[in-house]
A protein has these predicted regions:
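Short, charged phosphate-coordinating catalytic segments
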Residues: 191-194
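Ferredoxin-like alpha/beta domains used as RNA- or RNAP-binding modules
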Residues: 1-187
Length: 195
């Protein structure tokens, strides 16, 4: 994150911090990039007398919002965040294309939605779970009808237990030496190039 961008971001976050102090009510950022999360955590001392929390809608989300809470805030922090989850699934699974993250993200951004209002998109077989800011829920539910060539239906998920856990794959490779370029090349199944 460039110093100028970081400066503007931290000014915006300072405004949210002051809003929380003066209104005695939580304030939230939009979904943050990795650089913004890092800058915020490095400058956490700038925000005394409030509780800073980050949440993305589910326990293992990568994209998160930052929330500034008054010190005497008693509600559950994660439930206070203005995040909702939308399940996007094909109307007719039999005729559905095989879709990847890029397809879902492209369909959502094609609606004119800013990337900072969209959190993680979790793909599970033929469906996807989209985390977004609460104020976009109705817009997405009524306007997202198609991803690639597949007709979709959307519904809000209120129980987070319905969202599948993140799946990981274990790959075993043998490398000639434990150098980073050999390990990365083995992971992406590429050969090392010599010039």
């Amino acid at each position: 994150m460039g110093t100028k961008q970081e400066h503007f971001f931290l000014q915006h976050v300072q405004d949210l911090y002051h809003r929380t102090i003066y209104n005695d009510y939580p304030s939230f950022t939009e979904f943050l990039t990795t650089g913004e999360m890092s800058a915020l955590l490095q400058n956490q001392k700038m925000f005394p007398s409030v509780v800073l929390r980050m949440w993305g809608g589910h326990k293992d989300c990568d994209s998160k919002m930052a929330g500034f809470f008054p010190a005497d805030f008693v509600d559950a922090y994660d439930q206070a965040f203005p995040i909702c989850c939308i399940r996007i699934s094909p109307v007719h699974e039999k005729y559905a294309d095989t879709l990847i993250h890029r397809d879902y993200l492209g369909a959502v951004l094609n609606l004119g939605i800013s990337r900072s209002t969209i959190g993680d998109i979790r793909i599970c077989e033929k469906a996807a779970y989209l985390f977004c800011v609460e104020e976009l829920k109705e817009f997405i539910l009524s306007n997202l009808r198609q991803v690639k060539h597949t007709i979709m239906e959307c519904r809000e998920i209120s129980e987070l237990d319905e969202i599948p856990e993140r799946q990981y794959e274990i790959h075993r490779q043998t490398v000639a030496s434990a150098r980073l370029d050999n390990i990365v090349a083995a992971m992406i199944r590429a050969r090392r190039q010599t010039n």
